[in-house]
Amino acid sequence: MESYAYSLDEILAMSWDKKLANDLAQEIGSATGDKPDTVLEMRRFLALKGYRELLDRVSEACRGKSGDQALSAVAHAIRRYALERPALSAAAFQTAAVDCPEWREAHERLHIFMIDRFAECGLFGKAAENALNMLRSLVRGYMLHEIMHTLIGVDSYEDAFDKAVEVFVAGLPIFASAGRNS
């Protein structure tokens, strides 16, 4: 097993970003047998893995469900994934890089899946895109609060998130009517 230890001189001479990138590259190399040579390659690797895992999770979560029930199940699956795999979910929440067809394809597959869930709820076009952005913000916000324990007076983050998703889903008709008016 390789040692990833750095001497004090190396640590002081190297930016933390570079050290972390080197550590990640070594970890990825150990796990996959491939050695990413650049930070961009690592970002691609992590984003592709995150997109694929997240798509598997949300697909499984809404199996046998449709409409509001499917969307609620998807929201909970995204939150659970974000809590279990914060780095991969962060990579998957990013906008696809324009220089990598695999990244764009993985992003597009997840995006189409999500837009289809909103279509089941009567949202199309810009209304569906706006609702998707709001859902991403809702999930990220609750995930960050849960990780940092920053919501005061909350006994259960799960229960609080359940209520937030209920309110979000109940408000979807507002997006639908706004989409027809624009």
Regions found by a protein language model. Name each.
Residues 42-45, 49, 59-87, 99, ...:
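Hydrophobic alpha-helical connector segments
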Residues 13-45:
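Helix-turn-helix
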Residues 97-122, 129-134, 162-170:
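Amphipathic alpha-helical packing segments from all-alpha helical-bundle domains
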Residues 1-14, 117-119, 148-182:
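C-terminal peripheral helix-coil segments that are non-catalytic and often amphipathic
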Residues 79-100, 144-151:
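Amphipathic alpha-helical segments used for helix-helix packing
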Residues 6-7, 23, 37-60, 73-77, ...:
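Alpha-helical structural segments
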Residues 21, 25, 72, 128-136:
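Short, well-structured alpha-helical segments
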Residues 29, 136-140, 144:
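Amphipathic alpha-helical core segments of compact helical bundles
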